[in-house]
């Protein structure tokens, strides 16, 4: 039976490159000279540092710009609130989403069940596998998922016939 997997995975090589390019631009920009503005990547978290809110916002804008240029969807970013660290410095954590959380997976599963297509959706850890008898039904399900779940950068892979 034909099937496909619905996943939500960022290309971490491109994320790393975008963070490195952001750090390079921060180092060369005149308005960041003599400030503590910086950006770091650890595991699946990007940490932004700055002296004030507007600096953090500028660093975040640079990061979003670099990610967009590298074809990484900015919907992968989960921006946290800025935190004060020693003195007048600020830190902001930006988490990179990876995988579909159980709430979103259940939403996708419910969407497919309510669509009246002859398909089954199974939640498998951080992805949703959709199985059906006809390839046309699977393509209709892909279109339906893309249309109704716009807040997640979903991709479809592992298409089996």
Swiss-Prot record:
Pfam families: DUF520. Transmembrane segments: none annotated. Coiled coil: none annotated. GO terms for molecular function: nucleotide binding. Signal peptide: none annotated. One of its GO terms (cellular component) is cytosol. CDD domains: YajQ_like. Keywords: Nucleotide-binding. The keyword Lipoprotein does not apply. Nucleotide-binding protein. NCBIfam families: PRK05412.1. Belongs to the YajQ family. This is Nucleotide-binding protein Dtpsy_2240.
């Amino acid at each position: 039976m034909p099937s496909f997997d619905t996943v939500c995975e960022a290309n971490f090589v491109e994320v790393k490159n975008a963070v490195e390019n952001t750090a390079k631009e921060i180092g060369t920009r005149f308005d960041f000279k003599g400030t503590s503005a910086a950006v770091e990547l650890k595991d699946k978290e990007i940490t932004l540092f700055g002296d004030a809110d507007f600096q953090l916002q500028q660093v975040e804008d640079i990061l979003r710009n670099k990610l967009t240029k590298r074809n990484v969807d900015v919907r992968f970013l989960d921006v946290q609130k800025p935190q004060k660290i020693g003195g007048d410095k600020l830190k902001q954590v930006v988490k990179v989403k990876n995988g579909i959380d159980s709430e979103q997976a259940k939403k996708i599963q419910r969407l497919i069940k309510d669509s009246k297509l002859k398909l089954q959706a199974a939640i498998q850890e951080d992805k949703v596998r959709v199985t059906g008898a006809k390839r046309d039904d699977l393509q209709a399900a892909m279109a339906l998922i893309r249309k109704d779940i716009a807040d997640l950068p979903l991709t479809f892979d592992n298409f089996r016939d």
